[in-house]
Structures are given as C-alpha cells and as structure tokens.
C-alpha cells in the first residue's frame, strides 16, 4: 500500500534556511526573513521580565543575548516562525503564549532584488515559564525588563530594544471587574508604543491613557 505524501508544511520545513546578502555585503540569516519572540511575564512584584537567550558561542553573534528566533520558512507567518522557534530553542508551548503584536524591526535590500526583514513578535505568558534550552542556547534567562539593556545584547536586538520596551501603566479597576483577570499584560497603545499594564484600585487617579487602555482590555 503506498504511503501518504508528507503534509505541505513537512515538505517545505527548513526551506528558509540560508543567507540573504545585502547590497553592502552583509549576510542575514533567513531566505524569507526571520522572526523572534519577545516574551514577557510578570515577576512576583508584578513588574515585567523578558525571556532572553544567551547565544551559544559557536552560533552567529555567539555570546550575546537576544530573543529565541530564526529563519522563516516560505509557508509561515512571522508569528508561526517565532512560536515554532521558541518551542525548538526554549521548550515553550504555544498554548502558554498570547501574541500581542508584531513589529518589523529590521529591513534590508539584498542583491538580485532580494528583500530581508526581521519581525519581532511581542507576546505574554501568565507566569515565568520553565524553559528547556537546546544546543543554540548557552542559557535561557528571565531578565527584569529594566535590566535588559545592561547585558551584551545581539546588535540587532540592541538596535530595536528602545522601541520594544514598555512603560508602566496602572489601570484603576474595581475588585469585581473581570478585566483584572487579564492583567498584567502588554498593550500596544499605538504603533511602536508599548505599555505594561497592571491593575490598580478603583479610586486611583486614572492615567491620561486610562480610558484608551480600558477599551483595549
């Protein structure tokens, strides 16, 4: 009895592996671009932590800290790439992640009319998840967001970090308000502006963006 042909996604799995060379001669990994997962989760005090990957020394830009991620395959969206790579490199389950936004943080014109992009997929987890590093990771670490810039970052991540980091915002909510269950979390208040929103008491003075934040919960 003939065997069934492999699913399309299995046939093309890995077809994104390869380099795109820019007009200036710099090589970028991913024939169809690349994507990485910027995952936040609340620390015990409610402030955000970011999951960072300490890249193995043998890898490209080894020894630096960045996001789990990699080459995008031809059949994938950036979100699918980032979630897949976070599973492969950090052992994360897609069911534990909530994607909040995608941001193209790098664009390059390559030779022969090729084009390369890096997409940062912003997501939240409800808690500091356990991780399982693969051989591409010397270490995986939850880092307090205000300490990320203190590490030796991957140059691409370092260049985009300022536009990806959050500002704190407290949302006044009654104790019985069911929206409390959705906090803390990341909210993109407008393109390139992210807030880390935590619940506050109903009698707290609302922030200037309070009404808009509430409408997005």
Swiss-Prot record:
GO molecular function: 8-oxo-7,8-dihydrodeoxyguanosine triphosphate pyrophosphatase activity; metal ion binding
Sequence ranges assigned to domain Nudix hydrolase in this UniProt record: 30-164
Keywords of this entry: DNA damage, DNA repair, DNA replication, Hydrolase, Magnesium, Manganese, Metal-binding, Mutator protein
Catalytic activity: 8-oxo-dGTP + H2O = 8-oxo-dGMP + diphosphate + H(+)
Disruption phenotype: No visible phenotype.
BP-aspect Gene Ontology terms: DNA repair; DNA replication
Annotated region described as Disordered, given as residue ranges: 67-92
TM region(s), chain numbering: none
Residues where Mg(2+) binds: 70, 85, 88-89
Function per UniProt: May be involved in the GO system responsible for removing an oxidatively damaged form of guanine (7,8-dihydro-8-oxoguanine, 8-oxo-dGTP) from DNA and the nucleotide pool. 8-oxo-dGTP is inserted opposite dA and dC residues of template DNA with almost equal efficiency thus leading to A.T to G.C transversions. MutT specifically degrades 8-oxo-dGTP to the monophosphate.
Family: Belongs to the Nudix hydrolase family.
Protein name, as recorded: Putative 8-oxo-dGTP diphosphatase 3
Native organism: Mycobacterium tuberculosis (strain ATCC 25618 / H37Rv)
């Amino acid at each position: 009895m003939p065997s069934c042909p492999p699913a399309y996604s299995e046939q093309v799995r890995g077809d994104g592996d390869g380099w795109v060379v820019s007009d200036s001669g710099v090589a970028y990994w991913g024939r169809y671009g690349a994507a990485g997962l910027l995952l936040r989760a609340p620390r015990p005090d409610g402030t955000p932590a970011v999951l960072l990957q300490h890249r193995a020394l043998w890898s490209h830009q080894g020894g630096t800290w960045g996001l789990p991620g990699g080459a995008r395959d031809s059949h994938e969206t950036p979100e699918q790439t980032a979630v897949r790579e976070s599973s492969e490199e950090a052992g994360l389950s897609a069911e534990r992640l909530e994607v909040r936004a995608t941001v193209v943080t790098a664009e390059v014109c390559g030779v022969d009319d090729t084009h390369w992009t890096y997409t940062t997929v912003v997501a939240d987890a409800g808690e500091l998840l356990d991780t399982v590093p693969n051989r591409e990771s010397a270490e995986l670490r939850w880092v307090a967001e205000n300490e990320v810039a203190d590490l030796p970052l991957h140059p691409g991540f370092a260049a985009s970090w300022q536009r990806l980091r959050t500002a704190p915002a407290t949302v006044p909510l009654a104790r019985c308000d069911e929206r409390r269950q959705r906090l803390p979390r990341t909210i993109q208040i407008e393109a390139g502006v992210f807030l880390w929103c935590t619940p506050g008491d109903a009698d707290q003075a609302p922030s200037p963006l309070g009404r808009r934040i509430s409408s997005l919960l």
